[in-house]
Amino acid sequence: MEGTGLLTAVLVFLFAAVVAVPIAQRLGIGAVLGYLIAGIAIGPWGLGFIRDVDEILHFSELGVVFLMFIIGLELNPAKLWQLRRSIFGVGAGQVVITAAVLGALLYFTQFAWQAAVIGGVGLAMSSTAMALQLMREKGMNRNEGGQLGFSVLLFQDMAVIPALALIPILAGNEGGANDWVKIGLKIAAFAGMLIGGRYLLRPLFRYIVASGVREVFTAAALLVVLGSALFMDALGLSMALGTFIAGILLAESEFQHELEIAIEPFKGLLLGLFFISVGMALDLGVLFTHLLDVLLGVLALVFIKSAILYGLARVFGLRRSVRLQFAGVLSQGGEFAFVLFSAAFSQRVLNAEQLALLLVVVTLSMMTTPLLMQVIDRILVRRYNAQEESDEKPFVEDNDPQVIIVGFGRFGQVIGRLLMANKMRITVLERDVSAVSMMRKYGYKVYYGDATELELLRAAGAEKAKAIVITCNEPEDTMALVHLCQQHFPNLHILARARGRVEAHELLQNGVKDFTRETFSSALELGRKTLLELGMHPHQAYRAQQHFRRLDMRMLRELMPQHHGDVAQISRIKEARRELEDIFQREMLHESRQLDGWDEYE
């Protein structure tokens, strides 16, 4: 695929995504299923625009690679160590039990025992790309169900390495001393990557940032991601695992958030490409000729996997409210099954018919997951929103609320308690089902649902409410809600939480003036108390705090069009710091002559 052929393929992919995904969202089946359907439409069994599916599928794995890098950035070695019990307990248990059960079923359906073993292991793997995307959409990524799901996926990624090593043994090619030498060299190269990354990456990025050219920083981020992926691929290991480790090595660096911003656009596009490629890989010929076998295989895979995951979640102590979501989101086959089964076919562990059948089962199981999660959502809505009406509209007992609060984590709870203490009528929308369950025990009227859905906002009373307070964890959700409210509820006053300066800039650019950066006010208050401890007069410390607040807000507005780390911004920040020092010096001279303020401020 070269020249104009590549450009044509890119054009077809973009057109398919632009057409299919908005339609899928309007139909309520989700973006992931929209991508899969688009892939079927343009693939060999659809309109036939693209036929070289294997090459596209291999390239599209970069979407998973970028996703794992960003996940690695959000972790650090200490947090990873905290997850060891769930990774090697639940993760290992899920792979071993699922592989044993599914492998036994394959053996009893005329698979040779070698083929049954590798088939069971491959089917035990879940789709990292799909599961993480759905966990983010459903708000699971910050509750215990999402954490446990991530641990299971991480163990599965690591389990691919010994699974690939197992294939030659099952094929009867145990190998000799040369193979052990190759394994030793791979281990040494992997250790070299860890050590080199640990001591070279931060100095590299410091050197690049010093140039003041943002494009070079983005290029360096892409170099690290693609370089670590190709290095691991050359070793015969998981590309996604390599970039995940690279992300962890940079997780505690000062460049963490800027790297996320640089990589995010590529991750989204390539993940979409991955899902389209999976849809293209669906062999409808096998589906038609083995329809009953395929349908039974998909049902068995999803049911058995969900049941095992649900049981493990119960043993692990997961709350009942999140067990269903945890079991459903990991119930499908995964992208690593394509790698394992193809390798097994090349070693003649699987024959052509078995390979085609297993790949179709895996692909269709991936298509069932978005639908299964919608069914689970409906079950949870009925359970936690106490729906009494027979229609299918979202149910919220709004009672004409004055304020709608979206997100009821620690930040949202403080706001809610303050408003309720002042007899304000509020409606709270939260999509973390475990938080809904817990808050209801304490008497809060919290309703389960995704506030980015227009019907839920209407049911919550957005047309009559005076204000909406947005405290979402994800910046994308915050901006989606802002646009939704501005378009459909123009009289609804928007107040929002910003997690940092980048999100604050986005809110300002979209006309939201009432926002609070979550750490800014508390940090200022602690700074004021530090000034008091150092002997500053209370009134003077308060005025210093207010001067700093006003100047920082002015800088936020002035620097809005500029990018973080640009030379112009750095220069303006230094200028503002000097300006602030001059203000404080004048204040101190004035206060030394006339201290007519109060003596205490507590």
From Swiss-Prot:
* Record's subcellular location: Cell inner membrane
Which BP terms in the Gene Ontology apply to this protein?
proton transmembrane transport
Protein family = Belongs to the monovalent cation:proton antiporter 2 (CPA2) transporter (TC 2.A.37) family. KefB subfamily.
A molecular function (GO) held by this record is: glutathione-regulated potassium exporter activity
A single GO CC term, please?
plasma membrane
- RCK N-terminal domain residues are 400-519
Which Pfam families has this protein been placed in?
Na_H_Exchanger, TrkA_N
Task: Give the source's domain of life in one word.
Answer: Bacteria
Q: Which gene encodes it?
A: kefB
Assembly: Interacts with the regulatory subunit KefG.
Instruction: Supply the alphabetized keyword list.
Output: Antiport, Cell inner membrane, Cell membrane, Ion transport, Membrane, Potassium, Potassium transport, Transmembrane, Transmembrane helix, Transport
- Membrane topology (UniProt): Multi-pass membrane protein
Can the keyword Metal-binding be found in this entry's annotation?
A: no
**Presence of the UniProt keyword Lipoprotein in the record:** no
Record protein name field: Glutathione-regulated potassium-efflux system protein KefB
Coarse class of the primary localization is membrane
Q: What does this chain do?
A: Pore-forming subunit of a potassium efflux system that confers protection against electrophiles. Catalyzes K(+)/H(+) antiport.
